[in-house]
């Protein structure tokens, strides 16, 4: 069997990815299909953590722009990420995958509190860990949550699963037919070019902690496994020089 390129990964899913074609809410069939993809990777012995956004249920910034207190709006969004985490955890458990949800805001009736040592223990035992409620503080995105948790659990890579986009381009490929895809980039290039893969805080965290970032199309079955085993798909962002 091929040796995996990455042995411990954190998968970042957007909330919208759980919504299916509707674009809002949670489409259970879509979540179940994603869970199946993740299960196949877990069965290869890969240690997996997940961070899921909440944009399918709530967005804090537009709510704040409409007059809602920004802190309250962000906390509302954090609760949305917990809803997504619980649904994904249930879908994984129904496939026989041992899964734990840990939240940055304590809610003992539905999830464990986030404790780094416990999360590491779960991963070492082959359990999938889903991190919910962001980092527990307003003004921080789920991209930043993904970068922070990846650093804390010493993940080899963050897999940015994108909806219908197969990597990073120099322009929006949906609007510009001449857009060119990057196969490799450095974290510093992403920041200096202002490429919107993650927000600046998340990009800097990934760079400072030497965590690879792989951006790929999650709609293609088997792509998570392909990334883990080193197939050249999507765009890989790392601290390595482009000239290897």
Curated annotation (Swiss-Prot):
Q: Taxonomically, which superkingdom?
A: Bacteria
Keyword annotations from UniProtKB, A to Z: Allosteric enzyme, ATP-binding, Cytoplasm, Kinase, Nucleotide-binding, Pyrimidine biosynthesis, Transferase
Query: Which chemical reaction does it catalyze?
Result: UMP + ATP = UDP + ADP
Instruction: Name its GO BP terms in alphabetical order.
Output: 'de novo' CTP biosynthetic process; UDP biosynthetic process
- Just give the chief location class: cytoplasm
User: Can you tell me which residues bind UMP?
Assistant: 54, 74, 135-142
Pfam families listed in its UniProt record: AA_kinase (PF00696)
Q: How does this polypeptide assemble, per the annotation? A: Homohexamer.
Return the similarity comment.
Answer: Belongs to the UMP kinase family.
Q: What is this protein called?
A: Uridylate kinase
Q: Which organism is it from?
A: Streptococcus suis (strain 05ZYH33)
């Amino acid at each position: 069997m091929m040796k995996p390129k990455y042995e411990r990964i954190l998968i970042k899913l957007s909330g919208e990815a759980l919504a299916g074609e509707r674009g809002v809410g949670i489409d259970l069939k879509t979540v179940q299909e994603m869970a199946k993809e993740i299960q196949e990777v877990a069965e290869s012995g890969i240690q997996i953590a997940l961070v899921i956004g909440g944009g399918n249920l709530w967005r804090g910034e537009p709510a704040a722009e409409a007059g809602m207190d920004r802190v309250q709006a962000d906390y509302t969004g954090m609760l949305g990420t917990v809803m997504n985490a619980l649904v994904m955890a249930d879908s994984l458990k129904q496939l026989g995958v041992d899964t734990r949800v840990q939240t940055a805001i304590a809610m003992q009736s539905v999830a464990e509190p986030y404790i780094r040592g416990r999360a590491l223990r779960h991963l070492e035992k082959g359990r999938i860990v889903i991190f919910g409620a962001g980092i527990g503080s307003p003004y921080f995105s789920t991209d930043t949550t993904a970068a922070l948790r990846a650093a804390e659990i010493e993940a080899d890579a963050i897999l940015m699963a994108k909806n219908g986009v197969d990597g990073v381009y120099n322009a929006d490929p949906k609007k510009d037919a001449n857009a060119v895809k990057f196969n490799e980039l450095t974290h510093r290039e992403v920041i200096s070019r202002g490429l919107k893969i993650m927000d600046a805080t998340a990009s800097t965290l990934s760079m400072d902690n030497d965590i690879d970032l792989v951006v790929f199309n999650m709609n293609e079955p088997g792509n998570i496994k392909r990334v883990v085993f080193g197939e050249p798909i999507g765009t890989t962002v790392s601290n390595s020089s482009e000239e290897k």
